[in-house]
Amino acid sequence: KKKGIPAVPCLPVIYAENPITAGNEKIMAKEMDLSGYPYVLEQAEEVEEAYLEKIRCRLLGLPCEILQTKRCIVREICLADVDNLYEIYADPSITLYMEGLYAKKEEEIAYTRDYIRYQYGIYDFGMWIIEDGQSGEVIGRAGLDLRPDREDAELGYMIRKNRQGQGLAYEVCTAILAYAKEELGFEKLFARTRKENLASVMLLKKLGFHPVCAQSETKEADNAQIEYYIALS
């Protein structure tokens, strides 16, 4: 509290057949309501500095840093990023192959607030912000999304217009693939792009993705998406 960190319930728990209490510890019976405790660890060894730092950021409403590359920082989105995203998405080329933002900024802010709370809070991953490692400028987004009908996650990426063609998407996505395997435990990922989006197609192939099938979203063949997958072996 002295450092501005909100207080949250904390209770050491030990499992036993018969529920008793001893000092500050709770001996856990077969059933126990833990709904008031936002973080539950099964082993004391799981309490590592990096994990505690992530909890600190969550409680203070700060974006957690996910990873760094040679030129970029990948971190969670925060509400302060919304204005930067509207500036980036104002270029028509950005929304040529992907969905745009809400027309009303207050709706985008509300969506972002819920995304931070539920997507990051529950799954611990999602679409992240890409920052220039030197200037701190927001230069794009990249990350992993879940689909209701899929167990594997979808890789997504976007680099602002004036920073495209510099190899940044490849640099960041390569690091995200490693993170997905080593930190999140994914065995494979998929990605979708339109066949006429040649830059995206080339990026996926360079990353090691393989085409699966064409999936038409509309009756026009030019709007068909190609699905790619990669095994994280």
Labelled PLM ranges:
Residues 115-129, 140:
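A short helix-loop-beta-strand connector motif used in the catalytic cores of GNAT acetyltransferases and
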Residues 2, 7-10, 18-83, 87-96, ...:
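Acyl-donor (CoA/ACP) binding surface of acyl/acetyltransferases
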Residues 107, 116-120, 148:
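Generic hydrophobic, helix-prone segments enriched in Leu/Val/Ile
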Residues 13:
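Major-groove DNA-recognition helix of helix-turn-helix-type DNA-binding domains
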Residues 93-115, 125-126:
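Conserved GNAT-fold acetyl-CoA-binding loop/helix
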Residues 89, 98, 119-121:
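Hydrophobic residues in alpha-helical segments
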